[in-house]
């Protein structure tokens, strides 16, 4: 387990992430005194986008091979269609998401990233929002889709798009600071930040086989 794991947040992404949906939550978390690791399938850096145009690259702190869910108190999944489409097919990313959810840790997921929740088998019975074109996928996976700037269902926080980031970051910080305080007090794992949610391990899931399956994001 990593040193000072009680104040460390994971962000999983790859090439094609929507820039603001990664950089703004990371800034909000770091400004609150939390440590953030950018985790990707490969080392080096990942390419961001502003809508359809390439923007900045972000250095990778750890690869999925190196990252352990036990080292983190929360998980952020930024959007970007290319990013989310690649990560939903990555077995290591899916296992990481399931482990975080099974430990009742906050999952903050925005825009196209709920695809990753669907592919992890974690949408059934949950209420969430997303980029509007994902609503049929969420409903077909057994989830309830609503059109709101931010939706909180137990440990799950979801938003639709970059315009929703102020509300998304507000709810993320509220739940991560709760998790941080609980972990620092020795109540580890801290449990469901919002209460009342069954553990992912208590719900039927279609788990992918363990492994390191990777798929590159398609070119635009």
Role assignments for model-derived ranges:
Residues 111:
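Catalytic nucleophile serine of serine hydrolases
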Residues 1-103, 107, 115-127, 135-220:
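Extended, subdomain-level signal for the structured scaffold at the beginning of enzyme domains
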């Amino acid at each position: 387990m990593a040193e000072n794991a009680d104040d460390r947040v994971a962000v999983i992404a790859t090439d094609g992430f929507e820039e603001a949906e990664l950089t703004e939550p990371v800034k909000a978390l770091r400004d609150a005194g939390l440590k953030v690791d950018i985790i990707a399938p490969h080392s080096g850096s990942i390419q961001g986008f502003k809508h359809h145009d390439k923007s900045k690259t972000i250095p990778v702190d750890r690869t999925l091979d190196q990252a352990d869910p036990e080292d983190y108190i929360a998980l952020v999944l930024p959007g970007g269609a290319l990013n989310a489409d690649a990560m939903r097919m990555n077995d290591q990313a899916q296992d990481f998401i399931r482990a975080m959810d099974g430990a009742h840790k906050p999952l903050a997921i925005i825009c196209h990233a709920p695809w990753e929740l669907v592919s992890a088998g974690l949408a059934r019975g949950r209420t969430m929002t997303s980029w509007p074109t994902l609503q049929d996928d969420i409903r077909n996976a057994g989830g309830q889709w609503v059109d709101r700037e931010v939706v909180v269902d137990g440990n799950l926080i979801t938003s639709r798009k970059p315009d929703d980031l102020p509300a998304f970051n507000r709810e993320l910080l509220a739940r991560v600071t709760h998790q941080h305080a609980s972990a620092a007090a020795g109540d580890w794992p801290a449990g469901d930040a919002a209460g009342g949610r069954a553990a992912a391990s208590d719900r039927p899931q279609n788990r992918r086989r363990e492994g390191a399956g990777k798929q590159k994001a398609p070119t635009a």
